Amino acid sequence: MALTASVKEELAHLQVRKSAVRAAELSALLRFAGGLHIVAGRIVVEAELDTESVARRAVRTVGEVFGHECELGVMSGGGLRREPTWVVRVARDGEALARRTGLLDAHGRPVRGLPPTVVNGSVDESAAVIRGAFLAHGSLTEPGRAAAMEFTCPGPEAALALVGSARRLDVLAKARQVRGVDRVVVRDGDTIAALLTRLGAHRALLQWEDRRMRKEVRATANRLANFDDANLRRSAQAAVTAGAKVERALDILGDEAPEHLRAAGRLRVANKQASLDELGRLSDPPLTKDAIAGRIRRLLAMADRRAEELGIATTTEFAAQAGGAQARAH
């Protein structure tokens, strides 16, 4: 499965309990994937999505949080679009939903960016805004020099609002216009990893970082000619970062983590260059690639949740800080 699809599928099944956070996510999703239409003199809210599970998540939120009935349809792919498009539509209570999600202001005028209540909400709501925008029109490219998390925006005001939400999460995002289309882009690999963590895409993060490490190690290995120390340090950096995150998780959790998760973590720390397949074979008893990946993912997720409760650096933030300090030392 492509990275973008993996992230969307995982986020579509993320459990969120707070109604305000769910509302912020839906507000961004409708703003970035939808629009307001006048049909027979009535306002209709409509959003077009490329993933069925995302569309069904939106339908549930409309019903459970706002209490409105929602239609879900599908348009078959045609022309340049091969895949079907899922259409979420609220007709009978369209105006009420538009006002409550901030698509319309108090005077009934369309909001061009994002509503102030969402922009000025909590940090969790800021993360929900970015999650909703990604589910609507986000993409994640393969790790490498051109790695990017990108959001296609309905206009410059929405792009600037998204940049502001990212800033509240200490994430550097840049708004730009490409061929008349407004976009928001996050480029730095460590920043992308941190953002995936904040959005709740822990499984996709593990997949992305595994690919990132392999690509960086392969790229460096191809450049090595004389195997000098400086090049060897660069070739090992990605593996060291992955190991540092797991070490951080073990430090944060200590004995709080279940033994089988600690064992998987210790195995990763002791074999930083090994692939997930190799780690699985080294386990006692042997595990599948998915099983060892799942254990490491759960260990990191538990540690990140605990770190946020304690107000200390998460595994990704710690690894980024350690990498920066090491780079300055050299």
Curated annotation (Swiss-Prot):
Domain of life: Bacteria
Keyword Cell cycle among record annotations: yes
GO MF annotation: an example: DNA binding
Coiled-coil residues: none
Keywords recorded for this protein, A-Z: Cell cycle, Cell division, DNA-binding
Disulfide partners: none
Keyword Cell division recorded: yes
Signal peptide, first to last residue: none
GO biological process, one term: regulation of sporulation
Start-end of DNA-binding region: 275-308
Alphabetized HAMAP family for the sequence: HTH_type_WhiA
Function statement: Involved in cell division and chromosome segregation.
Family: Belongs to the WhiA family.
Protein name per UniProt: Probable cell division protein WhiA
Protein species of origin: Kocuria rhizophila (strain ATCC 9341 / DSM 348 / NBRC 103217 / DC2201)
Gene symbol of the encoding locus: whiA
